[in-house]
Amino acid sequence: MNYFSLIKKTVNLLNVVNLKKYSINSNMYFVNRESCIKNNKFKKILLYFPNQEFMHFGDHLFFEPLAKFLKETGFIVKIMPIKTMEFYFINNGYDIGKDNDILDADLLITRVEMYNEVIKFKKNTLFIDIASSNIKHYLCQDIVNKVADFLLVDAKSFYAKPSKINNYHGKIELNPDIEYITFNNYIDSGFYRVRKKHYKHLSDYCKHFAKINNLSVIHIGTKKDKEKDKNYYDFVDLDLRGETSAADLFYIASLDNVKYNISFDAFIMHIFFLYNKKSFILFRGRYTKEARNFVKQYLNPPFKPEPEIKIENIVEYI
């Protein structure tokens, strides 16, 4: 996300003010553009998130449990994610929506940041603010519970944890006799809160941790990250920057000999959460205490860990 995108996101967030009159709870807004359809008559639901300026990789994971719940409850569900995350939903058995599904849907579900884009469709739309400090539960469960209340269906027994991907190997081959740690020192969203000292601390921590635990370091990042980064990392054993897809990251995290992750609070962290593996996180921070508390309590991780998993076993801030 560049500064222009950041400005656009800020402007779109101001639309929350315009949405206040449509509020149905502390962070959701329903705009009824087709009054002949009542809440409990919705059948076809489209989760609409194709704009990569406002929908990052990890954001999709927050909404997958909702899609699963709606599908299990009997709704006809389609999803329009960003192109590079279509694989995730296809792998988990969802139908990918097309442009004609926008008109065909009884209800659109999207983020408040997409207000200006979605309001033009003149459809029944449920806007969700997933960054609201009013959220007081794990984000995935909060989304499911509140949407269920809106649709007049019961979600009390539903456990909202994002799905992994299945039966995917990809092109990455790791030595099964070596134990690894992934290292990702790049950031998109929230880059303006990160300074040189933060990057140095992340690198120094990884170098030290890998050495004392006899771990080989896998450097993760995009091709663009690698081209822009002129630093030399003498502790990296396997440089996979520019060589991994999002699906590859799921595969790497699933391997028994990949033990830990060191990164900012970003997409790869959320993948490791799914496999109950520990991430050492350099927190990007937030501007208010309420926002910081929300992220640490209900977003990292965005789901309630299984009873046998302690929070400190999957996330530690460095």
Across the structure, where does each feature detected by a protein language model lie?
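N-terminal pre-catalytic "stem/leader" segment of glycosyltransferase-like enzymes
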Residues: M1-I96
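Structural motif
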Residues: L107, Y180, Y260-I262
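A nucleotide-sugar donor-handling region in carbohydrate enzymes
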Residues: D129-T182, I187
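Donor-binding and catalytic core of enzymes assembling or modifying cell-surface/extracellular glycoconjugates
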Residues: H201-K289
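Secretory-pathway glycan-assembly enzymes, especially type II membrane glycosyltransferases
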Residues: F69-A155
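Charged active-site motifs of nucleotide-sugar-dependent glycosyltransferases
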Residues: K44-L46, P176-T182, L215-S216
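Extended, non-globular alpha-helical segments
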Residues: L19, S23-N27, N32-N39, G221-S245, ...
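Conserved catalytic-core segment of nucleotide-activated headgroup transferases in glycan assembly
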Residues: M55-L66, T73, D188-H219
